[in-house]
Curated annotation (Swiss-Prot):
Name listed for the protein in its UniProt record: Large ribosomal subunit protein bL17
Annotated region (Disordered), positions in chain: 123-178
Keywords tagged on the record: Ribonucleoprotein, Ribosomal protein
Biased composition (Low complexity): 123-139, 151-160
InterPro entries cross-referenced by the UniProt entry: Ribosomal_bL17, Ribosomal_bL17_sf
Tree of life domain: Bacteria
Cellular compartments per GO CC: cytosolic large ribosomal subunit
Subunit structure: Part of the 50S ribosomal subunit. Contacts protein L32.
Compositional bias per record (Basic and acidic residues), positions renumbered to this chain: 161-178
Species: Cutibacterium acnes (strain DSM 16379 / KPA171202)
Family: Belongs to the bacterial ribosomal protein bL17 family.
Any GO BP annotation: translation
Amino acid sequence: MPKPTKGPRLGGSPAHERIILRNLASQLFEHGHVVTTVTKAKRVRPLAEKLINRAKTDTVANRRFVNRTITDRGIVHILFTEIGPRMEGRDGGYTRVTRIGNRKGDNAPMAVIEVISDKVAPKAPASAADAKAQINTATEAKEAEPEAPAEDAAAQAPVADEQKAAEVDEKAEEKPEA
């Protein structure tokens, strides 16, 4: 059973609050970040997270669910083609709210809500066997690396010789002047 939210609503009526949250979510997906009040940022965050979670799997049902909230087809396309696939390995926490101080006119606390674009760091291995396997693959990768710098050093050797020759020529030119 739906329960009313406690305290004052954003914009006055529940319908106006829903419209405000829809517009904030749309602008967030279109621009990547939105500067708004802390209260609005905290209220739009769960809605944005829910929509991004739906956008991770591109199905007709998920597109219809998102279209109920965001009516602009261009923004829905951005959500499903850019933002959703980028969050594929992440299990929540798609947005970040950062406080930026107070607004000059009315001293309202302001915040920036943004879609996180950082890559997901690989998780730590769960067991000791996984840790050993990860270490083994890392050492194999390090053993393969020295071959490439040897080729680079051979390619850079003629360049270094040319630079030394140029320095010798410069020193020879300086001696007659002194």
